[in-house]
Structure formats: structure tokens, C-alpha cells
Amino acid sequence: MKVICLAIGKPKLSFAAQGVREYEARLQHYSSLSIEYLKARDESAALLSRSEGAYRIALDERGTQMSTLEIAQEFTRLEGRGEIKSVAFLIGGADGHSSSFREQCDATWSLSRMTMQHELALVVLLEQLYRVYTLKRGAPYHRE
């Protein structure tokens, strides 16, 4: 299953950009991953257009919270559905996602109840995806 991460704006914080590069390199061994940075003009339309045909997951503080193991189980469930060829994680800009945008997505997940910058949300997402893929490959998990 292809994983697409769509974010509004490139990371400007040097440590966030470094974190993205680190996890992007790690994930290349496990998954077909692409990260795309979109311009802030009409971000909802841009995110929806670029994710057309994918299973859309909006990342928003109002979404469903899951543990790493629950995310891994959800990935396994999505992979088991043959019609889903790609999953797109949609990270909005500073104002987050509107309720009408979230309704157009297949799911809304929360990385935390805390508000965080969108560039940090991308790093947290990639780190969790890395954990999910290592778990799926049978790596030991210290939380079990």
C-alpha cells in the first residue's frame, strides 16, 4: 500500500526538516512513501485534489486517538481491503482543517490532544509510521 503524506508548506524549522529527512530515509526500506508539500493557497482544495483516489486520513486534534499498536492494526485492516491502493495523510496549515474538510475524508486521526505546528506533526507522523512498519515486520516492541 502506497503512503502519501501531504503537508501545507515545507518545514522551516531546521530540526523538523532534519527529522523528516531521517524518517523518510528509514521508511524507504519498508514502504512506498511520498511526501509532498503544497502551497498554502486554498489548502483544502489542494489537499483534496492531490489525494484523489486515495483513502484520506485528515490529521487533526479533534480526530480519533490511537496507540501505535492500534495504528498498526488499522494499517493491516486497510491493507486487507483490496480496493485501497494508497493512503493519504493530510496535514493542514496553521488553522487546521475545517469540519467540512474533515467530512470529505475517510477518517480523521489525532496525533495528540495537544496543538502542534504542522511541520512537527509531519515528523511525529513519520516516526509513528516507521514504528508501524517495523512492528509489521516482526521487530520487537518494548511496550508489549
Regions found by a protein language model. Give the residues of each.
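S-adenosyl-L-methionine/SAH cofactor-binding core of RNA-modifying enzymes
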Residues: Y30-A88
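N-terminal beta1-alpha1 ligand-phosphate binding loop
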Residues: M1-Y23, L27
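Structured adenosyl-cofactor binding patch, chiefly the S-adenosyl-L-methionine
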Residues: S99-R143
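Short glycine-/polar-rich loops that comprise or flank the Walker A/P-loop
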Residues: M1, A54, Q104-D106
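Catalytic beta-strand/loop module used to bind and position nucleotide/cofactor moieties
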Residues: E70-S100, A107-M116
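Conserved strand-to-helix beginnings and helix N-cap segments that scaffold or border functional pockets
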Residues: A17-V20, T68-A72, R102, L122
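Short glycine-rich anion-binding loops that position phosphate/pyrophosphate groups of nucleotides
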Residues: P11, E61-T64, G93-G96
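Conserved RecA-like P-loop NTPase ATPase core
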Residues: C5, I57, G92, L125
